[in-house]
């Protein structure tokens, strides 16, 4: 997929998605396409701040980038929150994945009975008229070992509720039935499409 790619069927419904992660774009691309919405991928790094909550991080990033591109856009950030670790790594998920990796998280949970966790995505939509946040959450548990070769990030160790497979063992379509990212984007779409009808 190129740095700027579109999907969907209605040329009047096009949204700029800011991310340097192609996997995230692919997930949202599939959801948008199924709703007849066009997504344009702006492949640039986010302007991030160190903060203790995802809402503050994405709001800052979205506003900062909007001031440059001056087009309606979405910025998203996601975190893995492990209950036995008091919500760690949370908003520091990307940093922890790079430093500890999947094995590092599994070692932290070695011998821990409570493996419950959740993924949370927060999306910020910015236009010349508004700034809105949309959230998606999926509950589940951390697996005992790394499983699956699909997906990205912590997908190989996260099993959503009512499933036995990790996200990394699912296709994008299967993952989107549970995905925190898909839920957040659908929440945005419901708002966006209802606003266009008024």
Describe each region flagged by the PLM.
Residues 7-16, 23-198:
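Anionic-ligand binding patches
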């Amino acid at each position: 997929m190129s740095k700027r790619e579109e999907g969907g069927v209605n040329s009047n419904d096009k949204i700029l998605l800011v991310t340097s992660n192609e996997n995230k774009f692919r997930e949202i691309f599939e959801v948008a396409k199924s709703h007849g919405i066009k997504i344009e991928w702006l492949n640039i790094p986010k302007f991030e701040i160190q903060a203790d909550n995802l809402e503050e991080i994405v709001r800052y990033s979205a506003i900062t980038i909007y001031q440059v591109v001056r087009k309606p856009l979405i910025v998203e950030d996601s975190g893995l929150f492990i209950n036995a670790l008091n919500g760690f790594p949370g908003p520091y998920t990307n940093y922890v994945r790079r430093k500890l990796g999947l094995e590092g998280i599994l070692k932290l949970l070695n011998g821990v009975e409570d493996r419950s966790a959740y993924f949370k995505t927060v999306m910020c939509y910015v236009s010349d008229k508004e700034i809105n946040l949309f959230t998606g959450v999926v509950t589940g548990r951390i697996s005992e070992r790394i499983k699956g070769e699909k997906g990205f990030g912590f997908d190989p160790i996260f099993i959503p509720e009512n499933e036995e497979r990790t996200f990394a063992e699912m296709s994008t379509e299967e993952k989107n039935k549970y995905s925190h990212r898909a839920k957040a984007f659908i929440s945005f779409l419901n708002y966006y499409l209802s606003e266009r009808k008024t």
